[in-house]
Amino acid sequence: MVGIIVVFPNKDNATNIRNLLVRVGLNVTGVCTTGAQAMNYADSVDEGIIVCGYKLKDMMYSELREYLPDRFEMLLIASQGKWEEGLASGVMGLTMPIKAYDLMNTLQMMLQNMDRRRRKRKKTIKSRTPEQEALIR
């Protein structure tokens, strides 16, 4: 199951973004203010997207990214200056002030990419070597 987790130090900002996502039909798994809470929500889903700000109450976005499994992607919402030097792998960025249209399109694109990778993983699992086929029979 793909989960979307919204993490911002200001609970009101996180709730507003969650309401925006729910309004367009996206399923939001959780809203939180700390990276530890986000990791707790991440344990409850197979894969997902973390929508977060640059600095959380207990850690920076880069620390949270390091702690998350590879099945998770991150959408960083921050001013351009915060991520000018580049972003880590698995992190996409949107500049503040954010437009609802840009947020929705970016999340849809990330969800499509995750779906494509999931299908690709399933195909590789189904293809077996002749030795594996012989063991099964």
Where does each model-flagged region fall?
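Two-component/phosphorelay signaling modules centered on CheY-like receiver
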Residues: 11-30
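Alpha4 helix (beta4-alpha4-beta5 surface) of REC/receiver domains from two-component response regulators
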Residues: 63, 78-96, 105
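Conserved phosphotransfer microenvironments
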Residues: 14, 35-39, 46-72, 79-82
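Conserved acidic carboxylate
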Residues: 8
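CheY-like receiver
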Residues: 114-137
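C-terminal output helix
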Residues: 98-111
